[in-house]
Amino acid sequence: PSFAFAGSLPGVINGDVTVMHTNDIHGSYKYSYNAGKGTGTVGFDGLAVLYSAQSNAPDFLLDAGDTFHGQSFATMSEGKSIAELMDTFYADGYDATTPGNHDWSYGADKLRTMTGNSTTSSPFAMLCANATSANGTWSASILKTLNRTWKDNESASTFNYQIKVGVVGAMDESLGSSLRADLVAGTSFSSAAGAINAEAKRLREDEGCNVVVCIAHTLNAKTFAAQLDGVDALIAGHEHVNLDENVTGADGKPVRVVEAGSAFAEVGLLSIPYEYDTKGTETTDDDTVSVYAGDSDEKLYTAKDVNDLLADPNNQSILNDVHSTKIKPLDDDFEAASNEVLGASAADYFYGEDAAGTHGWEMVRTTDFRPNNPDDTTKAQTIGHVICGSYLDLTGADLAIENAGGIRGGIAAGNVTAGNVIAISPYGNTVETWTMTGADFLTALEHSLQISDDCNKSYELQQAYVAAGHTEQEAQDKYKWRDDSGSVLSFGGINVTIDWTQSEGKRIVSATLTKDGTALDPAKTYTVATNNYIITNTTDFPTFANATKYTEWGTCEAALRALIGQSGWESKMASLAGTVSFGSATVDPTPAPTPAPSPKTDTKVTTKKTTVKLAATGDRTLAAVGACLIGGIVVIILGIIWKRRR
């Protein structure tokens, strides 16, 4: 009840529950902005600016998963760096998150206890209502009581009341089934919608919650929302989209569904309106709350909004403070870890003209598959072979692919550091295994070779233009790359012979598996290891649409680290990845025959048989001469016999 109120109390008080939210940040963590493009990353320092700029501090700061895994900054500390920032970056930090499918990459126990990396007394909660683990309990929800005050502007009297809000989290059970078995050993997933509905009911009936918000990492947010009962809003992750729609839930009531892109490019602010019915009295015992989720308001903020706010010196000060006191110390730790020596390389693995990457972007699409000397295969997709070899070693798959756009560096002979590996694979992409037929795989490789062939023609024209005195940029502007040039595939698990004189669909002369030496069978189904990006590119590679996802693994960078850390990794990689050679797709005509030996001068030899034998060589003259000689010998022998008989 209120003890400070005097004056005219309204029958209904309008208010909002505000939730600032993120999803799928994938280890992105600090602010950046490109004014020319109008794009950038909000980061935790930019988030602090957005948070502080609100007229009233948001009631909740929530995240919908795929948070602790992706960028090397996150993976090298197994998510601890991100967990620390979530907890301490500004104010009280995040209230809660829910696991995304990639967050399990460090194992279920490490994920469940991720909040243990907190340096505060009130860490964020890790919510997964539908997960059950043998080694510990997953939290299903959190509850927060919001103290509200209504003020009478005329009398300056106030009326105090409370709104109870529950937050429940879960991950789509179908995502759990795609995870590596060893990472989720002892953990099972029940129906996410069922678990959320049960917890929402408990929160309302047992805890007296007026508002229930769900955070969930789910395959399809709108389909998922339609299954929810007793939930006012769904803050979703996984689809990497900007979403703001009403969906009718299983209880017939609107569920506001929101999602804020990915990679910290966006931050959402959801306002859920309610009406607090005072019943016209100062007592609160019989007061009721009505929530109008369908009338919710969603605002989406980007790095540009942060940039605009930085015109205020106070906001710039907040950004600088978070960066210097929270982010920089972790950056320093990351830099030190990047200098760790993982192993040593006896050879250069070229990314372009050299291991350093001179013309790497150009060469990995072109002459890596078309050396100037057809007999020189020393540069043929060497860094691509290392990458594919690491995928094969990690997963045990039959085949592997990596697109040119995903490769950003090579390996020079000598010590290989963690930083070198990050430079090769900087995007935080993950390794996945899929199943597809040999025919679909070969079709994709053939189209990749066509893209490479077209890129090679562009590159030759560009180089000629540069030789004529123009800049490389002018050359690329005049002789442009194909838009899909980054889709050229490096591949592993097969020994391949390519005939560049043939057209698309006919260039692969032979392909044998490194596993067992058998020919790649178009009718057989194989397991293919790939990064999670290129396998979804069904525009350039339509046959990928026929593939079936099998298992998710760790980051591409982690696969490289694991391979290079092994003794004798280069020979292992070579045996797994296979070779590329160049030959002819045409079969030579029947070779010229070896001349037949002279027939024996045996009385049992017949002219008919000898003539046929010689004629088969194609030398009719020789056959005729042979027949005459043998005929003459027969005549002489008969003459001798006749004389003796005489």
Predicted segments, located by residue:
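Sec-dependent signal peptide cleavage junction
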Residues: S2-I13, V612-A623, W642-R644
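Acidic, metal/ion-coordinating pockets
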Residues: F5-T302, T378, I383-V386, T551-T555
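Feature captures C-terminal
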Residues: I13-T18, S28-N34, V42, S121-N130, ...
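Acidic/histidine-rich, surface-exposed loop or edge segments in extracytoplasmic proteins
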Residues: H21-A35, S345-Y349, E353-P374, Y427, ...
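Hydrophobic alpha-helical scaffolding
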Residues: K37-G40, N101, D182-S190, A260-G261, ...
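A short C-terminal boundary segment appended to hydrolase-like catalytic domains
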Residues: E154-Q162, Y274-V416, I564-D588
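C-terminal low-complexity, Ser/Thr- and acidic/Pro-rich disordered "stalk" regions positioned immediately N-terminal
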Residues: F582-R620
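C-terminal membrane-anchoring or membrane-association module
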Residues: C628-R646
